[in-house]
């Protein structure tokens, strides 16, 4: 094709474009009305977003005599529904089903275990309903509850929570439960933010689980290199009418981390902690991953030990992970070692 022939094609396209422009000017009002209707339809079609997650996990525990080890394979399916209420408010729901390999019955129950609204009241962000409550890595609290979250700020955020345990919470391993149960109440206040290479948080917890408990948490993370981070936390707790130790700590390293959208990405982490029973409520480590290394949390006065883990993105939206826990009671000679493995699919 010669340049002249190409120029003729361009000239015809420009002429048609000019005709379209003239027609658009002539029917501007009608097109505007049509545009409003089309935009409204597009907005309506995007009003609800549905996503999902499927996780297959296996837990293998080796614990002292008398401790329920909890070895099991589990297939957990979650469907998330997020809808727009208006320009300022959204609704989020989560349906969950669990299938276990260590029983011979069908696990057909599907539970709606998230149901909350999110929005702003003035400059304050608010979430209200049934949802997960966790912060600062979940080393004190990582549980589901019915309540409200309030937060204010950008780089430095102040937050307050009030919640009670929902009726579908799992029980702790062992004969003495140290997890949140239906109706247990927890109140949290804190401040946190990012200051250069350091992120820090200070939190206060007040709970009526087992007995009245007050916990102060100071946590910080320092970026040592591009993907390497040093984490640490100090805890001071007071469990009413007990003479348990009051001070605990955690120190750890984190390197990078698997990203579901980036094939081949990976990460490693390692933590060591010493946690008297007065310094935690429902930590992430004991909320289903590791077997608690005691039969009675008071006699054991909590736990100490280390946790290591790794994750790797096998394919887009498919991430494999492994965790190993070696924990022992702070008092007595009970212990528990747990190997947790999982593959997570998101869609």
Per-segment meaning from a language model:
Residues 1-55:
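N-terminal periplasmic/intermembrane-space "pro-region" immediately following the signal or transit peptide
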Residues 2-3, 17, 22, 38, ...:
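Outer-membrane beta-barrel pore domains
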């Amino acid at each position: 094709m010669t340049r002249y022939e190409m120029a003729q094609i361009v000239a015809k396209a420009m002429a048609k474009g000019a005709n379209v422009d003239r027609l658009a000017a002539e029917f501007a009002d009608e097109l505007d009305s049509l545009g409003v209707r089309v935009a409204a339809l597009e907005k309506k079609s995007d009003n609800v977003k549905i996503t999902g997650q499927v996780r297959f996990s296996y837990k293998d525990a080796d614990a002292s005599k008398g401790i329920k080890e909890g070895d099991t394979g589990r297939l957990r399916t979650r469907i998330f529904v997020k809808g727009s209420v208006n320009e300022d408010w959204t609704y989020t729901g989560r349906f969950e089903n669990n299938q276990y390999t260590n029983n011979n019955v069908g696990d057909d129950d599907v539970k709606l275990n998230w149901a909350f609204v999110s929005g702003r009241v003035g400059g304050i962000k608010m979430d209200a309903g049934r949802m997960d409550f966790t912060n600062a890595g979940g080393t004190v609290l990582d549980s589901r509850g019915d309540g409200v979250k309030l937060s204010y700020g950008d780089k430095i955020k102040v937050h307050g929570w009030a919640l009670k345990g929902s009726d579908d919470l799992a029980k702790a391993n062992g004969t003495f439960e140290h997890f949140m149960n239906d109706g247990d109440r927890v109140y949290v206040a804190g401040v946190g933010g990012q200051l250069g290479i350091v992120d820090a948080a200070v939190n206060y917890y007040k709970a009526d689980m087992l007995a009245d408990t007050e916990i102060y948490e100071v946590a910080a993370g320092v970026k040592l290199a591009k993907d390497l981070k040093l984490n640490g936390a100090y805890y001071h707790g007071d469990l009413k009418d007990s003479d348990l130790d009051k001070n605990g700590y955690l120190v750890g390293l984190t390197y990078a981390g698997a990203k579901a959208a980036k094939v081949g990405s990976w990460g490693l982490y390692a933590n060591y902690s010493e946690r008297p029973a007065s310094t935690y409520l429902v930590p992430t480590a004991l909320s289903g991953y590791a077997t608690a290394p005691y039969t009675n949390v008071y006699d054991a006065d909590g736990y100490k030990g280390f946790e290591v883990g790794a994750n790797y993105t096998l394919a887009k939206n498919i991430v494999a992970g492994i965790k190993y826990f070696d924990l022992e009671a702070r008092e007595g000679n009970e212990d528990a070692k747990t190997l947790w493995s999982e593959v997570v699919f998101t869609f």
